């Protein structure tokens, strides 16, 4: 469970800091349902840009933002992309909730909020003393640095040196310090080593997304809730929510699947990873190019026992489709050859690299279970193609100029031709094998307790269920914090 013990001195400092910087903190309930947000805050949002460094943008940590760069408010149905069957090659519906319309263009501001907020409103993190350290393979440290800036905290972003240029360029304007560790997406051990080094400084507080229970708390209560709302809004008579697929970086989004399985007991939940680093599937390891996922370990916060399937995606598939979806030649192919509408084609740019991998997982699941037009599979799009123009440029340099023939080949080879290989429907024993891998990273290397590891497997009620239920207690602390600052009353 999340420690919500109050540190009175730190809390007093944070309240004063919030007063000085006009910071009002949103509740989880408001992130679920923006109708609960005060009208005066909505009035401020109506003339605030989506990426503006303004504390009021904390209230845009929601799947319900209007699809506007400036002055957007909220909408009943979350932003999403439906993948047409003529593109996916499967008859079932695939709906993908979009992270593009969060501040920073990525839903990781939510996970980082879920990690920071409990320590901020309890005073365990003292904004006048501590630096917030965000170890990440890219987007989480962007979200953490952004939230730190909004909350007037100093931040340190840690990410692998081979991540996209766009990530580093943006971080330079937001983070107090950027540390580039050796390697690529899958080199998370090097990130952990750096955090141990930083821990020697008492002013450095680590918010490790792979281990912080605030991450699954947020995704269960906000992402899972929103995906359920989306399905209920778009389903047609006779359709069922058959499956959900999430590639695993920190595995935070997998807890959205925990909520979905409670609401839709027959739903199958799949975790995805890169074929080049298939740790879950076959204890594999290696570098890969699906930025944001697959880090050669099993995250502490992954409820493996509740996971039905593991799916590995070839990183070449996601790279080639990124170019198909985001070049003039690819767009022309989708319009002229597939008959996709202008809106459908333009929305394909809402898929970043890991989002493409998520959709490919959905297709493989659909083929494995032989899903029909009466089935719906859901997923999320962590970020959009905005973060990867440099990768598209690299692909053009590597493979030459794009054309209609290449577009057709990419669609056929990297989407339509997906097979049910490199995937595994997990038995009880296979799930436990994956869960047990946590021991080597978290108990042997990172100082976790073996009793807690066993409790994750044998005591769901007092581990995963208990964390999910802490949203109510956290909201009470947030409300008390806002009341202490007096800023809500002064609106």
Predicted regions located by residue number:
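PLP-dependent amino-acid enzyme catalytic core
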Residues: 1-491
